[in-house]
């Protein structure tokens, strides 16, 4: 892993088992290994590539005890999939155990367009690169406008209550 993690702790086995029971499957080995010491960790500023035109960063890894409730906020994810990280701008990274624990990107604006990021959680962690916001140099006039979906604030309020 190329980035530092802060504030994580070992997950309780009972919380891992409760999630596995709710999902009806075992959590992938690479994710379980991560949970042994980094449950709920916050990574240093980072970036990962979604596709040739887009990138994102992980804000926090979701504590295993909260995953099942957070899963209810995601539309169109497979039955044995579950969110493991909050990505920037209200998006998520999730794992799908029906696909051998592969990691996917879920975009709240395009929930039907799920993007595969890596074949496993461990491989996803290897995609995370340190990021320094000072490395971004915008040219005058480069940003013409920005837009936020009107329902986004309501989504965040609903999400934070769970």
What are these regions (language model features)?
Residues 101-109:
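Intrinsically disordered, low-complexity regulatory segments enriched in Ser/Thr/Pro
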Residues 1-94, 142, 150-162:
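A surface-exposed partner-binding patch
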Residues 31-34, 105, 121-124:
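Aromatic side chains
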């Amino acid at each position: 892993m190329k980035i530092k993690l802060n504030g994580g702790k070992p997950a309780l086995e009972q919380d891992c088992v409760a999630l596995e029971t709710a999902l009806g499957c075992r959590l992938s080995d690479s994710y379980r290994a991560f949970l042994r010491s980094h449950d709920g960790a916050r990574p240093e500023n980072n970036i990962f590539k979604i596709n040739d035109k887009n990138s994102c960063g992980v804000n926090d890894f979701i504590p295993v005890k909260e995953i099942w409730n957070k899963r209810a906020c995601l539309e169109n994810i497979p039955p044995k999939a579950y969110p493991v990280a909050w990505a920037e701008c209200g998006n998520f990274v999730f794992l799908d155990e029906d696909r051998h624990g592969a990691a996917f990107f879920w975009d709240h604006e395009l929930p039907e367009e799920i993007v595969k990021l890596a074949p496993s959680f461990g491989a996803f962690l290897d995609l995370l690169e340190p990021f320094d916001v000072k490395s971004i140099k915008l040219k005058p006039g480069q940003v013409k406008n920005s837009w936020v979906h009107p329902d986004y604030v309501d989504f965040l309020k609903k999400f934070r209550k769970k």
